[in-house]
Amino acid sequence: MNIRPLQDRVLVRRAEEEKKSAGGIILTGNAQEKPSQGEVVAVGNGKKLDNGTTLPMDVKVGDKVLFGKYSGSEVKVGDETLLMMREEDIMGIIA
């Protein structure tokens, strides 16, 4: 199944979760903190403005991005869980 985000929405694949803490302790289940970065896998056409024009997207497919801990909604695509969020929920692009 393919998903094409609409308007200013972005589909993000979350980065892999850390299996060990900074101190070397192996984390299991709920102890693992979900990373707040990922890779953009699809983008919409841009935000529709009141005057009818479309504001183009700043992010593009393949960008590594940072986002808030509670940003986006989880979406199941095949056997993978992705995040759908608005572009404004993205805090930055990792260079």
UniProtKB/Swiss-Prot annotation:
Its main location: cytoplasm. It is found in: Cytoplasm. Pfam families: Cpn10. Keywords: Chaperone, Cytoplasm. It comes from the Bacteria. GO terms for cellular component: cytoplasm. CDD domains: cpn10. The keyword Cytoplasm applies. GO terms for biological process: chaperone cofactor-dependent protein refolding. Heptamer of 7 subunits arranged in a ring. Interacts with the chaperonin GroEL. Together with the chaperonin GroEL, plays an essential role in assisting protein folding. The GroEL-GroES system forms a nano-cage that allows encapsulation of the non-native substrate proteins and provides a physical environment optimized to promote and accelerate protein folding. GroES binds to the apical surface of the GroEL ring, thereby capping the opening of the GroEL channel. Belongs to the GroES chaperonin family. This is Co-chaperonin GroES. It comes from Francisella tularensis subsp. holarctica (strain LVS). The gene is groES.
